[in-house]
């Protein structure tokens, strides 16, 4: 059996990435304060259809995701279909794979095209850290169910008497892993200690990311892939990411205190991604249908792979496990790539993965390979800046990476690009795209 992955339909046609778009990414409780993930999702999908001059009725499937779920609208994909002029019969369902969510939605639509079930689909993801499902304590939740069953005033009074004042306090969404109780920041601290990653190196990577992102915005390269978002009641708008440190100064990063290990830590707010609001989406088609409709695809999916590792120690190593699988399935080596886009959840996580890419020992002991994945050429790595600067709306990052690397490869005359990300739960993803 061949190790090569056939990312084509029965006619041998490739899976075309026709267009991609995202909202600006905004820090929590800033520009998108009060705007739900669903509203941002509808906003970006509608604008993507308008810019692409694609009849919404031609969309056969929409797969969309969010990580922080909205109890009022758990199937965000279906609500986007109903809110953007598509046929009510359009197939739509929602997915979640933590920070790899919109990679998952992309793969799902691609596989629907590969099987011949559809020719045109939309994938993406959105998340809001400003509109959150605020919960209640377990005791209050239990009491509320009992109240619904109580018949007399006396029974209801007895139920209320079981509650203390602290039971009435709201409960925000958990930021820790369900299985381990560790937050992502605590895991990043683990990785910094395991791989001896210094505070200086973390700050330097963050400074690089912000500097490159600022230069990228100044160049105008992002104007065609980031929409202007008008915020209800439509008296203001946001037209660029608001987390980027303009005129970043490396020395200023050292002033921040550790965020997760107050005494001995090296992970700070400045070398981590902030809680972020935003949405993104891409249009996928079979190669034949794209050409028949007159589109020039921005790229094609060459291979993809998902991975999962232990959640207790250094669980954000997903890129180091998923990347060699995607490379093998594409029949490539790391040095064959034109560009590499790695999600920067934390500088520590990014540097740990970069270190393990170059480690023969890691390859032998963890991957069963006789050679390292490869040394990363920094002239190819996150050349436009990364998530540390742009921000990270969990479900939206994957399709941001895909669109961004495809468009940059187009500007460079084509080539192949790796997009890869870690995700909560010890998950990882890698996708290789090719651009003509």
Curated annotation (Swiss-Prot):
| Species assigned in the record | Shewanella putrefaciens (strain CN-32 / ATCC BAA-453)
- What Pfam families does the record point to? Thiolase_C, Thiolase_N
The catalytic site is made up of 99, 392, 422
InterPro entries linked: 3-ketoacyl-CoA_Thiolase (IPR050521), Ac-CoA_C-AcTrfase_FadI (IPR012806), Thiolase (IPR002155), Thiolase-like (IPR016039), Thiolase_AS (IPR020610), Thiolase_C (IPR020617), Thiolase_CS (IPR020613), Thiolase_N (IPR020616)
Name assigned to this protein: 3-ketoacyl-CoA thiolase
Query: Might you give the EC number(s) for this enzyme?
Result: 2.3.1.16
Catalytic activity as recorded in UniProt? an acyl-CoA + acetyl-CoA = a 3-oxoacyl-CoA + CoA
Lineage in the entry? Bacteria, Pseudomonadati, Pseudomonadota, Gammaproteobacteria, Alteromonadales
Q: Which CDD domains does the record match to this protein?
A: thiolase
Say what the protein does.
Answer: Catalyzes the final step of fatty acid oxidation in which acetyl-CoA is released and the CoA ester of a fatty acid two carbons shorter is formed.
Q: Where on the tree of life does the source sit, at the highest rank?
A: Bacteria
Which enzyme class? Answer: transferase
Query: Which family, according to the similarity comment?
Result: Belongs to the thiolase-like superfamily. Thiolase family.
Q: Report the gene name.
A: fadI
